[in-house]
Curated annotation (Swiss-Prot):
<dbReference type="InterPro" id="IPR015421">
    <property type="entry name" value="PyrdxlP-dep_Trfase_major"/>
</dbReference>
<dbReference type="GO" id="GO:0030170">
    <property type="term" value="F:pyridoxal phosphate binding"/>
</dbReference>
<keyword id="KW-0663">Pyridoxal phosphate</keyword>
<keyword id="KW-0732">Signal</keyword>
<comment type="function">
    <text>Cleaves phosphorylated sphingoid bases (PSBs), such as sphingosine-1-phosphate, into fatty aldehydes and phosphoethanolamine. Elevates stress-induced ceramide production and apoptosis.</text>
</comment>
<keyword id="KW-0443">Lipid metabolism</keyword>
<feature type="topological domain" description="Lumenal">
    <location>
        <begin position="47"/>
        <end position="54"/>
    </location>
</feature>
<keyword id="KW-0256">Endoplasmic reticulum</keyword>
<comment type="similarity">
    <text>Belongs to the group II decarboxylase family. Sphingosine-1-phosphate lyase subfamily.</text>
</comment>
<dbReference type="InterPro" id="IPR015424">
    <property type="entry name" value="PyrdxlP-dep_Trfase"/>
</dbReference>
<dbReference type="GO" id="GO:0008117">
    <property type="term" value="F:sphinganine-1-phosphate aldolase activity"/>
</dbReference>
<dbReference type="GO" id="GO:0030149">
    <property type="term" value="P:sphingolipid catabolic process"/>
</dbReference>
<dbReference type="InterPro" id="IPR050477">
    <property type="entry name" value="GrpII_AminoAcid_Decarb"/>
</dbReference>
<feature type="transmembrane region" description="Helical">
    <location>
        <begin position="55"/>
        <end position="75"/>
    </location>
</feature>
<keyword id="KW-0472">Membrane</keyword>
<dbReference type="InterPro" id="IPR002129">
    <property type="entry name" value="PyrdxlP-dep_de-COase"/>
</dbReference>
<feature type="modified residue" description="N6-(pyridoxal phosphate)lysine">
    <location>
        <position position="344"/>
    </location>
</feature>
Length: 539
């Protein structure tokens, strides 16, 4: 002991003697600078590991370039030009907005004003990808039904369950009917599926991610959560990551454009809270290998969310009709939550979606309970406090009026037309279909023409398709609107391809140059800034 003390004293004296040559300020600053350098190196290493060395170096280079005199002003001016072009030549509705209340109420004139505004909308009947999922003569009766249901409950709010017991029951029945479609009757699901209605697919996804984060924090003590998604997963997962401070590990799709299970496995670590599979994914209409992802989730004891926002009211019926649909719901071991939109193929009013959980233990982590508020005790199941009971009633009316037979009939029509469109696209020289579509989304690209120029020609013919990237492509989300005009779509598409082949190059007012440049631009931060500028100018 004495030897150790003696050694420590001699070490102290030697250190003091050595350090006595330095100014006190140096002794104070040196460890602080060393700490700063260590933190900078750690942050740089983390950025490289997360985004890649090339991306980090490019971002640093762009930051340095923007510091040069005049460069930043030039970039801002060019961004303004692009935003104006995206807004159809700079035309904005903000210049015609009503900004003050009328002095005297307009009474019934408001209906005339609304009709005038509505007349400015794009003619969506038949030529929009997705967007409106019912059309034709039967749509008028369907809209009338759900509008009447909405009007009966337009004053209700399920936040006040003690007052509006009817709406609470309607929501419970919508959730239960949906759970019955997605596996609650199968023993493998555990029979405890539960959930809530939300305002749309994004809120359902936000809640599933938040719930998984809190559940895994309670279960495993994870405080630096990470989730694994395929690059084809919906952008709502990035929104959830930003909202809830979750690190995203984005995995490239495999050669079939599906979630790469091996890539997912490589990303799993002690901070992983969840994985995401899509059925189908929005870009290409392909169902990820949910069973294999479920095996991973079970093996590593993490959550697995299945995004059924598009497929929830098609896949169960397509499977019954004999289409080769791979497993996608709670029948798959490892699936802990599912999101599905009623306002798409469920034909409910816009603003209705459902988030489901495997059991109540998981769902409890979705709720927010507040005990210290002077306004009393408070608990809310979803992100919104007040919710429109009219939308819940509209969803209930849509589902119960159509029934199993109605959904089966609709699914049969759109699945048949989807396959015809797929085959028709494959027959057009210069086009190819991406992957093997499982459902009603058909994505296609070209190796001989600029597909975005094709999109501009299609837009001039009244079609509204979705532009995709990596690879540059388009897709059409087939709905009941298209069942009677799919031949017109294929004819217009072939004519558009022929036009671009004969006269390559952008058309006046087209967006092909913007989409093409955005896809090739290496600085994704610049693209992000453009999107933010566009949104700020648009709303």
């Amino acid at each position: 002991m004495e030897l150790a003390m003696d050694f420590a004293l001699r070490l102290r004296d030697a250190a003091n003697h050595h350090l006595s040559r330095y100014e006190p300020l140096v002794l104070l600053a040196a460890p602080l600078l060393a700490l700063l350098a260590a933190r900078t190196l750690h942050a740089a290493a983390a950025a490289v590991a997360d985004r890649g060395l090339r991306t980090v170096l490019l971002a640093l280079a762009m930051t340095a370039i923007k510091l040069l005199p005049g460069v930043s002003a030039y970039i801002n001016a060019e961004k303004r030009k692009v935003v104006d072009q995206l807004q159809s030549g700079g035309t904005s509705t903000k210049s015609t907005l009503r900004t003050e209340l009328p002095t005297v109420g307009l009474s019934n004139q408001v209906i005339n004003d609304l009709e005038t505004l509505k007349a400015r909308d794009v003619n969506w009947q038949g030529k929009c990808s997705g967007t409106v999922y019912i059309a034709g003569s039967e749509s008028e009766g369907h809209f009338a039904l759900i509008n009447k249901a909405y009007s009966m409950f337009s004053h209700t709010n399920p936040l006040h369950q003690d007052v509006f017991k009817s709406v609470a029951q309607l929501e419970a029945e919508v959730v239960a009917m949906t759970a019955a479609l997605l596996g609650i009757k199968e023993k493998s699901s555990g029979g405890q599926i539960c959930g809530n209605m939300t305002s749309g697919g994004t809120e359902s996804i936000l809640l599933a991610v938040k719930t998984s984060r809190d559940y895994m924090r309670t279960k495993k003590g994870i405080t630096k959560p990470e989730m694994i998604i395929a690059e084809s997963a919906h952008s709502a997962y990035d929104k959830a990551a930003q909202y809830f401070n979750i690190k995203v590990r984005r995995v490239p799709v495999n050669k079939e454009f599906l979630a790469d299970v091996k890539g997912f496995k490589r990303c799993i670590n002690g901070n992983t809270i969840m994985m995401v599979g899509s059925a189908p994914g929005f870009p290409h209409g392909l169902i990820d290998p949910i069973e294999e992802l479920g095996e991973l989730a079970s093996r590593y004891d993490i959550c697995l969310h299945v995004d059924l926002c598009l497929g929830g009211f098609v896949l169960p019926f397509a499977r019954k009709l004999g289409y080769p649909i791979p497993p996608f719901d709670f029948c798959v071991k490892g699936v802990t939550s599912i999101s599905t939109d009623v306002h798409k193929y469920g034909l409910a009013p816009k603003g209705t979606s459902i988030v489901l959980y495997k059991n109540h233990e998981i769902r409890k982590h979705q709720f927010v309970a507040v005990t210290e508020w002077t306004g009393g005790l408070y608990v809310s199941p979803t992100i919104a406090g007040s919710r429109p009971g009219g939308l819940i009633a509209g969803a209930w009316a849509a589902m119960t009026s159509l029934g199993l037979n109605g959904y089966m009939e609709n699914t049969g029509h759109i699945m048949e037309v989807s396959k015809k469109i797929q085959r028709g696209i494959e027959d057009i020289p210069g086009l190819f279909v991406i992957g093997k579509p499982d459902m009603t989304v058909v994505a296609f690209g070209s190796d001989s023409v600029d597909i975005f120029e094709v999109n501009d020609i299609m837009s001039s013919k009244g079609w509204h398709l979705n532009a995709l990237q990596r690879p540059n492509s388009l897709h059409i989300c087939v709905t009941l609107q298209h069942t009677v005009i799919y031949e017109e779509f294929l004819k217009d598409l072939k004519d558009s391809v022929d036009t671009v082949k004969a006269n390559p190059g952008p058309i006046s007012g087209g967006r092909a140059p913007i989409y093409g440049a955005a896809g090739k631009m290496p600085d994704r931060g610049m693209v992000r800034e453009l999107l933010v500028e566009f949104m700020d100018a648009s709303c």
